A protein has these predicted regions:
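Conserved Rossmann-fold NAD(P)-dependent oxidoreductase catalytic core, especially the SDR/UDP-sugar
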Residues: 70-73, 98-112
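NAD(P)H-binding glycine-rich loop region in Rossmannoid oxidoreductase-like domains
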Residues: 45, 54-91
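Glycine-rich phosphate-binding loop and adjoining beta1-alpha1-beta2 segment
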Residues: 30-57
């Protein structure tokens, strides 16, 4: 299985599209918030195994550590007008660090 954070964004959804078109493509799990700016539309024509919210990532990783083969980390708050610094820190730094540590511990390729 391939895990793609930010999989509903522009780059992430194009990666999902490219990977899902490959013959024998592995299952793809997307980590993203779909309600923001109708990002769900970016995935509407692509085959996705599962979609999880970033807040549930740690639990998902612990429950699926045997099946994840690669992690593409494309998720971040990219808004230039976001004013909640704590949210930016949690989403852009803490989540990245946590994911990096998990990948290192489990020897999973981390593509950033």
């Amino acid at each position: 299985m391939i895990l793609i954070t930010g999989g509903a964004g522009f780059i992430g959804s194009n990666l999902v599209a490219a990977l899902s078109k490959k013959t024998g493509a592995p299952k793809i799990t997307v980590v993203d918030r779909l309600g923001i700016d109708d990002k769900w539309k970016n995935l509407s024509n692509h085959l996705v195994h599962q979609i999880i919210e970033p807040e549930n990532l740690d639990r998902y990783l612990s429950e699926n550590d045997e099946s994840i083969e690669y992690v593409f980390h494309l998720g971040a708050i990219s808004s230039t007008i976001e004013k909640d610094v704590d949210l930016i820190l949690r989403s852009n730094f803490n989540l990245s660090l946590s994911l990096w540590n998990w990948c290192t511990k489990h020897r999973i390729p981390f593509i950033y």
